[in-house]
């Protein structure tokens, strides 16, 4: 018997966007902690970006993130942690 597909929704009041509205790894870390309540260290986010595990676009020396990409990454992260 197949498992039913679970649709994950962001927390109340958190809007997701495909636009690259978050500038920098520190801002991505802050969004993940403040908006989603994830217990992450900044170095974990930096390592995930460096390994290409966290979706981002690099322009010059700065990484840009979308809230939808961060939310989808957080779902994968929470499966590993929980």
Predicted regions and their residues:
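Generic N-terminal leader/processing signal
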Residues: 1, 21-23, 57
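Arg/Lys-rich, low-complexity, intrinsically disordered N-terminal tails that contact nucleic acids
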Residues: 2-9, 80
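Polyanion-binding surface elements
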Residues: 7-42, 76
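Intrinsically disordered, low-complexity regions enriched in Ser/Pro/Gly/Gln/His and often acidic
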Residues: 24, 64-66
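Generic structural signal for individual residues within well-ordered alpha-helical segments
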Residues: 29, 46, 71-72
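Major-groove DNA-recognition helix of helix-turn-helix-type DNA-binding domains
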Residues: 33-64
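A short, Lys/Arg-enriched interface patch at domain edges and termini
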Residues: 68-82
């Amino acid at each position: 018997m197949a498992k039913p597909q679970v649709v994950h929704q962001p927390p109340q009041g958190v809007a997701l966007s495909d636009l690259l509205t978050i500038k920098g790894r520190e801002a991505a870390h802050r969004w993940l902690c403040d908006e989603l309540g994830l217990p992450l260290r900044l170095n974990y986010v930096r390592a995930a970006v460096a390994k290409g595990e966290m979706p981002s676009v690099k322009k010059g020396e700065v990484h840009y993130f979308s809230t939808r990409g961060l939310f989808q990454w957080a779902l994968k992260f929470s499966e590993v942690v929980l």
